[in-house]
């Protein structure tokens, strides 16, 4: 096993007793480290980028969605999406994006195939690290993220579909959203679309509200179209 790359980490079992091979990796590759050579106690290897240490064990995330033709030409006929310790939202977004990319390729197979822009955009809408193609095209170039151990998180899941009654969409809140917010709706097999939050109501007491800011409470708002029972509603984070 690799000593310290995400999802395959023997350090997890050794350090905290959580076995990566059993889907329980603690992801020590994402922790902050200082290195010290054993014959020089107290003398740290001079590679710290910041006060918290360095991230030399920190791999970027593998992403091959733009290379479907090459994978098919290589004989790949089944794709496994890494999903251990990932959220249901992450799994939904990534599998949906790859499914759409593969369907688009097989509808018009060509070495010059390009993934639709909206599908590529999906890969930026869940928590991830900077992407790399790994070792698929030769020796790894710039495959580690040396400057930070953090994730790219530009979108929040705001709500999950609960019910629809006429023109009222009823949702289970997951992160706060507000009257007037533009939410993007992710449905299975469909290109995402947007809804504007109008006439927001807290279902517990039927009162109008400007903010859905009570965790896991049920809210409703007006919509002008049917929404899939499997829909996930998300909102782009405000830029600082």
Region locations from a protein language model:
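Active-site pocket-lining/capping segments in soluble small-molecule metabolic enzymes
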Residues: 1-78, 85-159, 166-240
